[in-house]
From Swiss-Prot:
The protein's role, per its UniProt record: Polymerizes chitin, a structural polymer of the cell wall and septum, by transferring the sugar moiety of UDP-GlcNAc to the non-reducing end of the growing chitin polymer.
EC number: 2.4.1.16
Protein name: Chitin synthase 2
Catalytically driven reaction(s): [(1->4)-N-acetyl-beta-D-glucosaminyl](n) + UDP-N-acetyl-alpha-D-glucosamine = [(1->4)-N-acetyl-beta-D-glucosaminyl](n+1) + UDP + H(+)
């Protein structure tokens, strides 16, 4: 759940940044409804229960209602949606409007079977992409902590040039407080 909350809180901080751009013709304080965060879990048995607890704390998941068979047919996935007004940081502390967090529209897709990453991408583009018809899609792996303005800069690349079909951000290792993460050889390399 720490990796999930690290990523989700980073996304929430980015949505707050979009809404802080008061001189923007696209964004501003009421810009948050233009963003939908889709979380796809690859297999009900594979997702960690504490991650589900974090999603429940955000209001987008309810434990105990998902069934694997309905009307004698196997269920492929369970879809939940909610507009949350709080975020959970890495320390599992709630952050809300008092900390600059704005509402966030969320879709949580809990796939019944673990079908791997490409299948999750297909779910995102074929199911949710067709329904939402987004102008820009940004894919993040769990554990990635986007800087507070990173998603804005990715969006801006698409907004400024209609010929841009893809963009990538820079990935940096989190060195931790006092750069203690550098004691880990994987981080240090």
């Amino acid at each position: 759940e720490i990796e999930f909350t690290r990523t989700m809180h980073g996304i929430m901080r980015n949505i707050s940044h979009f809404c802080s751009r008061t001189k923007s013709r696209t964004w501003g304080k009421d810009g948050w409804p233009k963003i939908v965060v889709c979380v796809i879990a690859d297999g009900r048995q594979k997702v960690h229960p504490r991650t589900l607890n974090a999603l429940a704390a955000l209001g987008v998941y309810q434990d105990g209602i998902a069934k694997n068979v309905v009307n004698k047919k196997e269920v492929t996935a369970h879809v939940y949606e909610y507009t949350t007004q709080v975020s959970l940081d890495e320390g599992m502390k709630f952050k809300g409007a008092e900390k600059g967090i704005v509402p966030c529209q969320m879709i949580f897709c809990l796939k019944e079977q673990n079908k791997r990453k490409l299948n999750s991408h297909r779910w995102f583009f074929n199911a949710f992409g067709r329904a939402l018809t987004p102008n820009v899609c940004i894919l993040l792996d769990v554990g990635t902590k986007p800087d507070s303005k990173a998603l804005y800069h990715l969006w801006k690349a698409f907004d400024q040039d209609s010929n841009v079909a893809g963009a990538a951000g820079e990935i940096k290792a989190d060195k931790g407080k006092g750069w203690l993460g550098l004691l880990n050889p994987l981080v240090a390399s």
